[in-house]
Amino acid sequence: MDNILLGPSISKHDKPKKLMVMLHGYGDNAANFIHLAEPLDQDEWGMHYVALNAPSIMPGNPMGYQWFDLYLNGVYISDVGPKEFENVRNLINENVKKISNTISLLTNDLNIEMSDCFVMGFSQGGMMAFEL
């Protein structure tokens, strides 16, 4: 289970035609973010929505998650040295693999083609979606 991510899903369809993977922002969580699916949904899309929790709990916010830490030893990410930045880059790459593994599992379970899978994200989740 360490190589996939979990989170809530919403679907109005027994056999959805498309998959929307939703990646929340820094300090948020999948349970909050999944509610954006309801106003987005159009019946004709046949969409299954799933929001994934980032793998790390945010320091100082036990209900919030992060895709990567913005503060390394109290220093903002844009001000860290090359070694620390490389560590963050490696973590981002690991988390992209987890997202990809999860998408593969979901498309297989739902019998949805990868070309019918969409990824959206907000803030840090948008950065992760871009990395895919």
For each predicted feature, which ranges?
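Serine-hydrolase catalytic machinery in alpha/beta-hydrolase-like enzymes
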Residues: 5-112
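Gly/Ala-rich beta-loop-alpha elbow adjacent to hydrolase catalytic centers
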Residues: 121-125, 129
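Active-site signature of alpha/beta-hydrolase-fold catalytic machinery across serine-
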Residues: 35, 131-132
